[in-house]
């Protein structure tokens, strides 16, 4: 099972879509406060549709609280547009943690410094960033492809 981590998500529709993606790929979703919405927000539920009741998810009050749940810090991969290595080059394993930052600014330097593994999604210089839910779909899809082999 993959562990998908959203640190301080801001947009309920993205979180709902990612929740549905996690149900479909049998991944666990980890949400780290603060959020830009309430989990009960109708937009989260609408985007996740009726799948939200099947979602395997956990929430944490802080990054530090979440970090206590990680058995092997070397299997944590932070998604960052500033990373040198593409997620295509990574060898994913069952149980890996794939971490995404907030929609507006990504991951803070403080968080990036806590983990050595940073990955990027290749992107045209004409585009600043991908939508968070789309970025999750890219990376989860590649990780699942590798795990099925």
Whereabouts are the PLM-identified features?
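Cofactor-binding loop segments of dinucleotide-utilizing enzymes, especially the Rossmann-like FAD-
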Residues: 9, 34, 81
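Amphipathic alpha-helical repeat scaffolds
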Residues: 10-17, 131-133
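Short internal beta-strands
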Residues: 28-34
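S-adenosyl-L-methionine/SAH cofactor-binding core of RNA-modifying enzymes
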Residues: 41-107
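Structured adenosyl-cofactor binding patch, chiefly the S-adenosyl-L-methionine
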Residues: 114-149
């Amino acid at each position: 099972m993959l562990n998908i981590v959203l640190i301080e998500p801001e947009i309920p529709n993205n979180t709902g879509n990612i929740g549905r993606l996690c149900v479909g790929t049998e991944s666990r979703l980890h949400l780290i406060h603060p959020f830009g919405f309430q989990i009960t927000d109708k937009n989260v539920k609408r985007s996740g549709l009726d799948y939200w009741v099947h979602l395997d998810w956990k929430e944490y009050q802080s990054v530090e609280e979440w970090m206590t749940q990680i058995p092997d810090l070397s299997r944590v991969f932070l998604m960052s547009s500033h990373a040198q290595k593409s997620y295509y080059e990574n060898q994913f394993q069952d149980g890996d943690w794939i971490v995404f930052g907030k929609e507006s600014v990504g991951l803070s330097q403080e968080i990036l410094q806590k983990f050595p593994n940073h990955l990027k999604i290749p992107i045209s210089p004409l585009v600043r960033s991908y939508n968070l839910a789309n970025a999750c779909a890219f990376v989860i899809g590649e990780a699942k492809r590798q795990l099925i082999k």
